[in-house]
Design a protein with these regions (language model features):
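Membrane-embedded segments
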Residues: 69-82
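Active-site regions of metal-assisted phosphoester/phosphodiester hydrolases
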Residues: 20-61, 73, 85, 91-94, ...
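Bacterial N-terminal signal peptides
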Residues: 8-18
Length: 191
């Protein structure tokens, strides 16, 4: 778990620094994680607003959490597809955590680059908690994974992180490109 101790502050810092202009070297990748809260939670039709925020920070890829896919709650909208369209037709992959109201609920990744491969892994579930997943996409220059860890149990979080570490080591320990993890880790500074 020590590997993940600094992840939330570093992701926050990366997001803050993202607004410091776009004079970055060509090999730089700007990653953003965003808990969408099924969009429309606070503002009706906030897809254009979120897309504009992502453009302003110069995102190359975005990890999204709390997404509905074709549920009755959100009028049958495939939210990841809709926000990817709002970004100008970005590529995307959805990771289904559970069936929900006629559709699915889960996490996703969208990117301006073409996705070459992807997979989703179910994570251990805390007692009485929602199902959780890890969704991984591979691009030509890097690999990015997203998850939404349990918020009800530190033990469940540890079990979920253990699976994430195992899966990522098995698949990418010898990778010649960088591997990133983003998402809602539900972590506090002292966790």
């Amino acid at each position: 778990m020590n590997k993940f101790r600094m992840l939330p502050p570093l992701l926050g810092l990366a997001f803050l620094l993202a607004g410091c202009g776009d004079s970055r070297p060509a090999e730089t990748v700007r990653l953003v994680t965003y808990n969408a809260g099924t969009f429309n939670k606070y503002i009706a039709d906030d897809y254009p607003l979120v897309a504009e925020m992502m453009r302003e920070v110069g995102a190359d890829a975005v990890c999204l959490n709390e997404l509905d896919s074709c549920t009755t709650r959100t009028g049958g909208v495939f939210q990841l597809e809709r926000i990817a369209r709002a970004m100008g037709g970005w590529d995307y992959r959805f990771g289904r955590a559970m069936p929900y109201r006629g559709g699915s609920y889960g996490v996703g990744v969208m990117t301006r680059e073409r996705i070459l491969d992807h997979f989703t892994v179910a994570l251990p579930r805390g007692e009485g908690a929602e199902p959780r997943v890890l969704t991984v996409v591979e691009l030509a220059r890097y690999v990015i994974a997203t998850t939404h860890l349990d918020h009800t149990s530190a033990a469940a979080q540890r079990d979920q992180v253990a699976v994430i570490n195992r899966v990522m080591r098995e698949r990418y320990a010898e990778a010649s490109k960088p591997v990133f993890l983003g998402g809602d880790l539900n972590a506090l500074p002292d966790s």
